[in-house]
Swiss-Prot record:
Stated family: Belongs to the ornithine cyclodeaminase/mu-crystallin family.
Protein name: Protein SAR DEFICIENT 4
Domain of life: Eukaryota
GO MF term list: dehydropipecolic acid reductase
The organelle targeting sequence, given as a residue range: 1-42
Changes seen on gene knockout: No visible phenotype under normal growth conditions. Mutant plants have compromised systemic acquired resistance (SAR). Mutant seedlings accumulate increased levels of proline.
Gene giving rise to this polypeptide: SARD4
Protein species of origin: Arabidopsis thaliana (Mouse-ear cress)
Location of this chain's protein in the cell: Plastid, Chloroplast
Organism ancestry: Eukaryota, Viridiplantae, Streptophyta, Embryophyta, Tracheophyta
InterPro entries referenced in this protein's UniProt entry, alphabetically: NAD(P)-bd_dom_sf (IPR036291), ODC_Mu_crystall (IPR003462), ODC_N (IPR023401)
Keyword presence, Plastid: yes
Length: 325
């Protein structure tokens, strides 16, 4: 008799998963499995405008990764009037051998962990090893995960400065993180002028839905690593053309060159060409492409996510959960 599927709620993730563990899991398994995982273009259905349903399937052909899965996300922007989140998600994991349902887990938290850990891995490879100051641009749900991922990736970090359009939210996040005993060696504070703190950053991580450039290239100091997470459409952009022009630009996968406003816009305006993109995450991990070449290089890492990292995250969550039962 087959085992019953398990349900893994959001509250269980912190006891199952750490950002450092997931970063290492990606570093080991992305080169091994990226060519064996199929991730079709996500399907987006308008169910009643402006609300929508998104489906993101992926499956592996490797016997060492016998899984397939699908992330289902609902987007209901008017939920704020009911004091509810606008986005909800779940992830269902199946056996690719028998087709049996193995687990259903919270898709929103899975996405927060996988997105931030991809950024953490980019930082681990591209940021300077003596980086001390992290600037966090944005203070939404993803921000604390990004901060924890960068801290795990670069143990040299000693100070985190948070900026948000609403200064109070940045201050509240800084106060919350400063109470975390895991980060008692780290100084957390907030600032209301982004232009003033950008020159301080060794690593700058952005997670916003901005349609106007927030990070200006003129303020980036030599040696900075710029991590761009928020944009996923041509209308969105978190930095200006100067930042893209000054940096060595890397992507998590090639879809970023199509979807991300910072890159698609730069291509259209002739600021850079597609051939100027220095490599993707798998190429960096494998050493096929060179990352940082000197301590004064500015590196830019743009990520948009993929079904591949969703599946690898679900694999780790499921297998870790079972090992502890």
């Amino acid at each position: 008799m087959a085992a019953l599927p398990v349900f893994i709620p959001a509250e269980s993730f912190p006891s199952i998963l750490s950002h450092e563990t997931l970063i290492n899991h990606f570093r080991t398994n992305l080169p091994k499995h990226s060519s064996t995982i199929t991730s079709p273009v996500r399907q987006n259905y308008t169910v009643s405008s402006p609300s929508s349903l998104l489906l993101m399937p992926s499956w592996s052909s490797s016997s060492s990764l016998p899984y397939m899965g699908v992330k289902l996300v609902t987007y209901f922007p008017h939920n704020s009037s009911q004091n509810l989140p606008g986005i909800h998600g779940s992830y269902t994991l199946f056996s690719s051998t028998t087709g049996q349902t193995l687990a259903t887990m919270d898709g929103t938290v899975l996405t927060l962990y996988r997105t931030s850990s991809v950024s953490g891995l980019g930082s681990k490879i591209l940021a300077r090893d003596d980086s001390q100051v992290l600037i966090m641009v944005g203070s939404g749900a993803l921000a604390p995960h990004l901060i924890k991922s960068h801290l795990a990736a670069k143990p040299s970090l000693r100070r985190v400065i948070i900026w948000n359009r609403t200064p109070q939210r940045a201050q509240e996040l800084a106060e919350t993180l400063s109470k975390d005993p895991q980060h008692k060696e780290i100084s957390f504070d907030s600032h209301d002028s982004l232009d003033q703190i950008i020159p301080l950053g060794d690593i700058i991580s952005c997670a916003t839905n901005s349609t106007v450039p927030l990070v200006k290239g003129e303020f980036l100091k030599p040696g900075t690593h710029l991590d761009l997470v928020g944009s996923f459409s041509h209308e969105m952009k978190e930095c200006d053309d100067n930042a893209i022009q000054r940096g060595s630009v890397f992507v998590d996968n090639d879809t970023a060159m199509i979807e991300a406003g910072e890159l698609a816009g730069a291509f259209e305006r002739g600021v850079i060409k597609r051939e100027d993109i220095c490599g993707n995450l798998v190429e960096l991990i494998k050493g096929d492409k060179e990352g940082r070449k000197s301590s004064t290089d500015i590196t830019v890492f743009k990520s948009v996510g993929s079904g591949t990292v969703d599946l690898l995250t679900a694999q780790l969550v499921h297998e870790t959960y079972l090992s502890r039962c």
